[in-house]
From Swiss-Prot:
Its EC number is 3.6.5.3. GO terms for cellular component: cytosol. Residues 136-139 are annotated as: G4. InterPro entries: EF-Tu_GTP-bd, EF-Tu_GTPase, EFTu-like_2, EFTU_2, G_TR_CS, P-loop_NTPase, Small_GTP-bd, T_Tr_GTP-bd_dom. It catalyses: GTP + H2O = GDP + phosphate + H(+). One of its GO terms (molecular function) is translation elongation factor activity. SUPFAM superfamilies: EF-Tu/eEF-1alpha/eIF2-gamma C-terminal domain (SSF50465), P-loop containing nucleoside triphosphate hydrolases (SSF52540), Translation proteins (SSF50447). This is Elongation factor Tu. It comes from Acinetobacter baumannii (strain ATCC 17978 / DSM 105126 / CIP 53.77 / LMG 1025 / NCDC KC755 / 5377). GTP binds at residues 19-26, 81-85, 136-139.
Amino acid sequence: MAKAKFERNKPHVNVGTIGHVDHGKTTLTAAIATICAKTYGGEAKDYSQIDSAPEEKARGITINTSHVEYDSPTRHYAHVDCPGHADYVKNMITGAAQMDGAILVCAATDGPMPQTREHILLSRQVGVPYIIVFLNKCDLVDDEELLELVEMEVRELLSTYDFPGDDTPVIRGSALAALNGEAGPYGEESVLALVAALDSYIPEPERAIDKAFLMPIEDVFSISGRGTVVTGRVEAGIIKVGEEVEIVGIKDTVKTTVTGVEMFRKLLDEGRAGENCGILLRGTKREEVQRGQVLAKPGTIKPHTKFDAEVYVLSKEEGGRHTPFLNGYRPQFYFRTTDVTGAIQLKEGVEMVMPGDNVEMSVELIHPIAMDPGLRFAIREGGRTVGAGVVAKVTA
């Protein structure tokens, strides 16, 4: 059978494996890549290639991550797998590898364990929208009732963190049996069933260009006779000459009209997601706009000063603080293009936060910033990064 030619026109979806240590995340990753390559074309990767995860830097934080790609009949998947629990925490909080959906691997021999719970909570906090469960090592459990029990426990755990536990697909199998090419329901069939569940349960993600227009402002210039130009990289959507935009954040929201879009000194009709543009604003004075604000489609994003966040605090080795911080700590929060001072409130019963910890906190900023849940930020002290976080919930 001739291998299908790789086509770039399949929709691209980002996924990853999560779950407790030694429950089989990396073995499953290898099994999916191998079986998809064999069945649908593409390149197989073996366990050792995935397990020797290379180091990467995201926002100055060292993270070990493996990236694997595979095809299903209708999609192209990019899959991340991390070797250690700390890598998952950092990866999910920094958004180094954004996931459109996660595969929760839970060993049927153990049932849900502490990191199973923690990864589900992290997924909820950082906004992973969908979870699919792979109940692994089912070939080592003789008792059907025990499998039912473990499946029920996992579903209840998902429901605890506001995932639809009752409707979540749960695939039973054995990653090792599948990787070894064994037939039967727990072998290769289980991995093909998992891929089919990815295809049907995770909706195709909305592309940046189809979202509402948003551009973080990096710089502001005054051009005599023409007005004020703001520059930045368009994060989402499309902006056309003549459209209205809002300037959001730091000060009161102002509405204005785009009178020109330029790129590399050339005038354009529109600016699109991913492009660096200069945008000319009608009747806006140079001092009314500043770095750290955003240009947005009117009504799509609001400025906020209070939010709950999930934060990873850099360890000493990563260049972070050497000492813990306490309630009321006031660092700078770096959103998109600027620093804003904020005060933190730790959860009840949490006295202090040690370097290397991840923690939930509430933050109150001294200026409002345009934000939605899922927005990433860095925590800085005098220009050096000491933490990374993600907005879990906006509160005021």
